[in-house]
Amino acid sequence: MATTGALGNYYVDSFLLGADAADELGAGRYAPGTLGQPPRQAAALAEHPDFSPCSFQSKAAVFGASWNPVHAAGANAVPAAVYHHHHHPYVHPQAPVAAAAPDGRYMRSWLEPTPGALSFAGLPSSRPYGIKPEPLSARRGDCPTLDTHTLSLTDYACGSPPVDREKQPSEGAFSENNAENESGGDKPPIDPNNPAANWLHARSTRKKRCPYTKHQTLELEKEFLFNMYLTRDRRYEVARLLNLTERQVKIWFQNRRMKMKKINKDRAKDE
């Protein structure tokens, strides 16, 4: 209880008077021996003589000589930042940065930032790390002069990243090439022996209609007026004279008879 009360009084003095005044008072009022080993722990070690004392070797200094040692009063006194009492959750701003260990090594305070921390743009930093901050404020008129290969925050300030600006001219050229290929290029011929191609591109089996010439139509009309029905021999002769097939002559006569029948029916209705 005596040790706890001494530490509490020291912390109150350091808070009211400051770190330097508290160190001077602590050096004269509180001896370093008050923070030594408790008597209960010493008695426990004396009761177990079988266990050998600890023989760990002291480690090498973690940091080099660039760390400046604190003055004697601050080294002997206990820092207020290390002993954090639950009644005072905040730390005095003038707390010492480093404390001296018994073996001469200097331990780093937990209040300082680690060396691996990065400094962001717009935030104050205690030491430079060689990182160039990106400019956050950019006008829309400055965006076309920027290099499109460097990706920064100013590219997004203009409304579109550089990748989209590169795609726009390439898409226009691609559409022009497609238009030229569709207009100038012919489709590849379809293999008639391929059943898949025939099924996908189904075509009608009906032959293309070939109109008769005027001479052929005139001769067929004369033959129809002479006889509406042709015999097989006469059909063969007419097909040979007009350079047609017998089937073509036969179909023409059938169509001509249907046409004449329709005309006669229309005449009967008019009368």
Curated annotation (Swiss-Prot):
Compartment annotation: Nucleus; Cytoplasm
Symmetric dimethylarginine: residues bearing it: R139
Keywords on record: Cytoplasm, Developmental protein, DNA-binding, Homeobox, Methylation, Nucleus, Transcription, Transcription regulation
PTM entry text: Methylated on Arg-140 by PRMT5; methylation is critical for E-selectin induction.
PROSITE patterns named among the record's database cross-references: HOMEOBOX_1, HOMEOBOX_2
Main location: nucleus
Tissue expression: Expressed in high level in the embryonic and adult spinal cord with a preference in the posterior region.
GO molecular function: DNA-binding transcription activator activity, RNA polymerase II-specific; enzyme binding; RNA polymerase II cis-regulatory region sequence-specific DNA binding
Gene Ontology BP terms: anterior/posterior pattern specification; definitive hemopoiesis; DNA-templated transcription; embryonic forelimb morphogenesis; embryonic skeletal system development; endothelial cell activation; male gonad development; mammary gland development
GO cellular component: cytoplasm; nucleoplasm; nucleus; transcription regulator complex
Source species, domain of life: Eukaryota
InterPro entries attached to this UniProt entry: Abd-B_homeobox_TF, HD, HD_metazoa, Homeobox_CS, Homeodomain-like_sf, Hox9_activation_N, HXA9/HXB9/HXC9
Outcome reported for the amino acid change (mutating Y11A): Significant reduction in interaction with EIF4E
Region feature (Disordered): 154-197
Keyword Nucleus: yes
DNA-binding region per UniProt: 205-264
A Pfam match: Homeodomain
Family matches, as SMART domains: HOX
Record-linked PANTHER family: AGAP004664-PA, HOMEOBOX PROTEIN HOX-A9
Function: Sequence-specific transcription factor which is part of a developmental regulatory system that provides cells with specific positional identities on the anterior-posterior axis. Required for induction of SELE/E-selectin and VCAM1 on the endothelial cell surface at sites of inflammation. Positively regulates EIF4E-mediated mRNA nuclear export and also increases the translation efficiency of ODC mRNA in the cytoplasm by competing with factors which repress EIF4E activity such as PRH.
Family: Belongs to the Abd-B homeobox family.
Subunit structure: Transiently interacts with PRMT5 in TNF-alpha stimulated endothelial cells. Interacts with EIF4E.
Name of this chain's protein: Homeobox protein Hox-A9
UniProt source species: Mus musculus
Taxonomic placement: Eukaryota, Metazoa, Chordata, Craniata, Vertebrata
